[in-house]
Amino acid sequence: MGITIVLGSQWGDEGKGKITDMLSQEATLCCRAAGGHNAGHTIVHDNITYDFHILPSGLVSPKCVNLIGAGTVVHVPSFFKELASLEGKGLKGAGKRIFISDRAHVCFDLHSVVDGLEEARLGGRKVGTTGKGIGPCYSDKAARRGVRVGEIMDEAVFERKLRTLHAGYTARFGDLEYDVEEEIGRFKEYRQRLVPYIVDQLAFFKQYKDSPNTLVEGANALMLDLDHGTYPYVTSSSTGLGGAVQALSLNPASITSIIGVVKAYTTRVGSGPFPSEQLNEYGDKLQSVGREFGVTTGRRRRCGWFDLVLCRYSHAINHYTALNLTKLDVLDDFDEIKVGVAYVLPDGTRLTDTYPADAAVQENVKVEYVTLPGWKSNTMGVQKYEDLPANARAYIEYIERELGGVPVKWIGTGPARDHMICRE
């Protein structure tokens, strides 16, 4: 089994969907390793726009079987709603090519209610979650009180565990705007509907042990990783290479490619440190031209310049074999383009390839930039590297050199599926 892993290298929203969609055309199997319906990306295929959250992007390819893996958390109503939406847009038979590990955890409406209450208690220190209940669900998993997807099939066990969760949160928060019996009633219907989708992950993988091409689709990104990201302003799962290997029980020796997806600039949704953020006309222009609004929340994304310190750190953890640089065309109309090359701490220490663990330190670094000339010409839809303006090629090659020679193999030049340069 040859395994390709696609990972976000910044704070998410890098455009992982397009490269995953492209690679899935040759894949036998596409897997989601972590996260839940908090993730979001868009794929444009045959002029139809598909929004993905919990489902793997490989569903767009009619020959690709898809798995929601053991490290994920599954909001069952969202699973069925998203599947119906995809089938309604023409992806017929998608429901026969999607499976869920019985070891994945169930994200309940209860978790969404608790998510909102926890954010409200934090006040000005809130994390800026999507409000989907992902954090509380992973908290229950870590505390060994969560409900696994496979347990939905045992009605008595399922109902006992959900009522216990509800009782615990009621003791903590008081009366909740949530009806546990109503949710239990909904799962009486979901129980039978879920039967065709639930699988033993290891047994499932044995069916594909001879697959020449397995694709792993990362959700979120390295800087949102629970261990390696800008803690506590992170998601609640392991979003890097290690998380994918763990959640899907992958053989590291079978990994042939690790693709880091990076925007040609940097964005972030929600709260937390963002050293290269531009709270000025440059940030506004990046946001406007790049149409930077979250697929899941609709929130305006914060925007800033490309951050080499962040990307060197991300590469050191995820060990990328190649990069996909996305949204190059957004930079077409800039006279000059800045790249963050170092952080300077308050005591004068200069960092170039490590990221401070302390969020307070992250908030107070000063970024040292280099300024590169813009190209002031249209790159939208360009498909050959040699057709890019010289300064655009220089920008890409500068990033390659500064990241230790990791090749930028794919370059996104627009939203359409074929707006992509593939460098051999």
UniProtKB/Swiss-Prot annotation:
Enzyme Commission number(s) from the entry: 6.3.4.4
Free-text comment on the cofactor: Binds 1 Mg(2+) ion per subunit.
Keyword flag Zinc: no
Catalytic activity, as annotated: IMP + L-aspartate + GTP = N(6)-(1,2-dicarboxyethyl)-AMP + GDP + phosphate + 2 H(+)
GO cellular component: cytoplasm
Residues engaged in binding Mg(2+): 13, 40
Binding residue positions for GTP: 12-18, 40-42, 301, 327-329, 412-414
SMART domains noted in UniProt: Adenylsucc_synt
Record-annotated membrane-spanning stretches: none
A Pfam family hit: Adenylsucc_synt
Protein name (record): Adenylosuccinate synthetase
Organism: Aspergillus clavatus (strain ATCC 1007 / CBS 513.65 / DSM 816 / NCTC 3887 / NRRL 1 / QM 1276 / 107)
